């Protein structure tokens, strides 16, 4: 009686088909005992190593090899190939709606009879394999040995494989991969499938994601803005960079606005800012100008000054556009001209030019009177006015000195040319004049003499016995001639002499 050792990894689909073509079948008496022994033994993968002693027929390579010579190796290879083909076709046919495969692992011994022709042995074999289901699922480890044919067949269809090998120096059935070795190969078709879907989900994921982000581009666009390389970059962006792409899309929105819209918005914004700045600064600058020039006359009539200031509170008009531009800078506070030496800004270019002269020391404007040089023409003009005021003061001082000289010369002449035996008295100069009466025995003509208040007056007290004509002639002639010159310059005062 010969014995054979078998390791099998089969599915319910292979229970009836592969073993139905065997030429010989074992007897029915030994299967109940074998099944009972395998159920009672908790270590199913180590069943043969623990229960079968050494020296038995399981490990003897010589015994039993002659009895199985009639089993050709071609029959087993054909069975293996046909079984793999059926498994592949069934697995592809039921790939969409198949259940997880069940793996049955077991080792059993066969004692075939040479003259037996019973073909009903797969039925007790099915009961044997069904009894080993729990033991196969509970065993965490098994022998890792496998033949090249079993590894090649398991790589093609891992969950369903059955390989056999016939050799003179080895048992009929070779060890097949057990559950722990086949579990990494069984579940990659199931567990990596959702993982593969998750990893490959990046391919269909961007199409629903980027159209949502592209909805933000619903603004008026010019075809020149849409460059092909930008669209290609959007399609190549991965799902991890999607938030940054959304941020870039928001930042690119203003650049996709038409140029006409940008220009209109910029013009409107600049006008609004100009109005705000003008109204704000006009409250600061304009009142001072209005107080300084309340009714400022203009040499040019209004119809010849077409450029008016746009500020509401300013009524200035200009005949040239550049003058209006310089004036608007007063309201806006714009200072586009900058000194490169001290970095000071100016609103007018001529102010910058005169400012640079303070750094260079250039003074092109010289005074015509004293020769003093100035950097600005208005400074020279202001300096010239100083000279004019000084000249006027000198002229005012020179006029009273020239007038006082004839008065002083008149006083001694008047005193010497008036020989009066009557005692006379000279009073101090007074600002007022009054008449001095002269008493005579006959009426005498009245003589009017005009002279200023600065001159001295003569007062004569007494009665003369000589003719009054002498007094009149000697007194009136020099006085009238001398005082007539003084009446030209000063305001006259009238003295009546009787």
Curated annotation (Swiss-Prot):
Residues 137-203, 287-308, 378-422 are annotated as: Disordered. Signal peptide: none annotated. Residues 179-202 have a biased composition (Polar residues). The record marks 305, 316, 320, 326, 344, 348, 372, 376, 382 as: Interaction with DNA. GO terms for molecular function: DNA-binding transcription factor activity; double-stranded methylated DNA binding; hemi-methylated DNA-binding; promoter-specific chromatin binding; sequence-specific DNA binding; zinc ion binding. SMART domains: ZnF_C2H2. It comes from the Eukaryota. Pfam families: DUF3432, DUF3446, zf-C2H2. Transcriptional regulator. Recognizes and binds to the DNA sequence 5'-GCG(T/G)GGGCG-3'(EGR-site) in the promoter region of target genes. Binds double-stranded target DNA, irrespective of the cytosine methylation status. Regulates the transcription of numerous target genes, and thereby plays an important role in regulating the response to growth factors, DNA damage, and ischemia. Plays a role in the regulation of cell survival, proliferation and cell death. Mediates responses to ischemia and hypoxia; regulates the expression of proteins that are involved in inflammatory processes. The lineage of its organism: Eukaryota, Metazoa, Chordata, Craniata, Vertebrata. This is Early growth response protein 1. One of its GO terms (cellular component) is nucleus. Binds to DNA motifs with the sequence 5'-GCG(T/G)GGGCG-3' via its C2H2-type zinc fingers. The first, most N-terminal zinc finger binds to the 3'-GCG motif, the middle zinc finger interacts with the central TGG motif, and the C-terminal zinc finger binds to the 5'-GCG motif. Binds double-stranded target DNA, irrespective of the cytosine methylation status. Has reduced affinity for target DNA where the cytosines have been oxidized to 5-hydroxymethylcytosine. Does not bind target DNA where the cytosines have been oxidized to 5-formylcytosine or 5-carboxylcytosine. Residues 382-392 have a biased composition (Basic residues). The keyword Lipoprotein does not apply. Keywords: Activator, Biological rhythms, Cytoplasm, DNA-binding, Metal-binding, Nucleus, Repeat, Transcription, Transcription regulation, Zinc, Zinc-finger. SUPFAM superfamilies: beta-beta-alpha zinc fingers (SSF57667). Its main location: nucleus.
């Amino acid at each position: 009686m010969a014995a054979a050792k078998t390791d099998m990894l089969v599915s319910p689909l292979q229970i009836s088909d592969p073993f139905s073509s065997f030429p010989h079948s074992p007897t029915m008496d030994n299967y109940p005992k074998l099944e009972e022994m395998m159920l009672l033994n908790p270590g199913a993968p180590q069943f043969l190593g623990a229960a079968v002693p050494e020296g038995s027929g399981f490990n003897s390579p010589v015994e039993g090899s002659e009895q199985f010579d009639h089993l050709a190796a071609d029959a087993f290879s054909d069975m293996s190939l046909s079984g793999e083909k059926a498994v592949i076709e069934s697995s592809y046919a039921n790939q969409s709606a198949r259940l997880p495969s069940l793996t049955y692992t077991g080792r059993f011994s066969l004692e075939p009879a040479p003259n037996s022709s019973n073909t009903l042995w797969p039925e007790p074999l099915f009961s044997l394999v069904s009894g080993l289901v729990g033991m196969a699922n509970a065993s965490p480890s098994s022998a890792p040995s496998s033949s090249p044919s079993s590894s090649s067949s398991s790589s093609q269809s891992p969950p369903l494989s059955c390989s056999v090998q016939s050799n003179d120096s080895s048992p009929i059935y070779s060890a097949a991969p057990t559950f722990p070795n086949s579990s990494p190969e069984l579940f990659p078709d199931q567990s990596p499938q959702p993982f593969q879907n998750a990893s490959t989900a990046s391919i269909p994921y961007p199409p629903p994601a980027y159209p949502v982000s592209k909805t933000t581009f619903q603004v008026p666009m010019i075809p020149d803005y849409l460059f092909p390389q930008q669209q290609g970059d959007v399609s190549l962006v991965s799902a991890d960079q999607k938030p940054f792409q959304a941020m870039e899309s928001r930042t690119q929105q203003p650049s996709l606005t038409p140029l006409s819209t940008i220009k209109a918005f910029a013009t409107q914004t600049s006008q609004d800012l100009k109005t705000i700045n003008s109204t704000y600064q006009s409250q600061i600058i304009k009142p001072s100008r209005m107080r300084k020039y309340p009714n400022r006359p203009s040499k040019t009539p209004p119809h010849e000054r077409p450029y008016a200031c746009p500020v509401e509170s300013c009524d200035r008009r200009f005949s040239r556009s550049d003058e209006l531009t310089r004036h608007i800078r007063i309201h806006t506070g714009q200072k586009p001209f900058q000194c490169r030496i001290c970095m000071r800004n100016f609103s007018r270019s001529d102010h910058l030019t005169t400012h640079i002269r303070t750094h260079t020391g250039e003074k092109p404007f010289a005074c015509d009177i004293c020769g003093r040089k100035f950097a600005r023409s208005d400074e020279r003009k202001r300096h010239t006015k100083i000279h004019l005021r000084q000249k006027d003061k000198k002229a005012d001082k020179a006029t009273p000195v020239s007038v006082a000289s004839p008065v002083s010369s008149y006083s001694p002449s008047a005193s010497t040319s008036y020989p009066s035996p009557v005692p006379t008295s000279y009073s101090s100069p007074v600002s007022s004049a009054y008449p001095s009466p002269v008493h005579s025995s006959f009426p005498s003509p009245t003589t009017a003499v005009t002279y200023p208040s600065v001159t001295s007056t003569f007062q004569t007290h007494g009665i003369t016995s000589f003719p009054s004509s002498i007094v009149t002639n000697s007194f009136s002639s020099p006085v009238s001639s001398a005082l007539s010159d003084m009446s030209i310059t000063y305001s006259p005062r009238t003295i009546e002499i009787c």
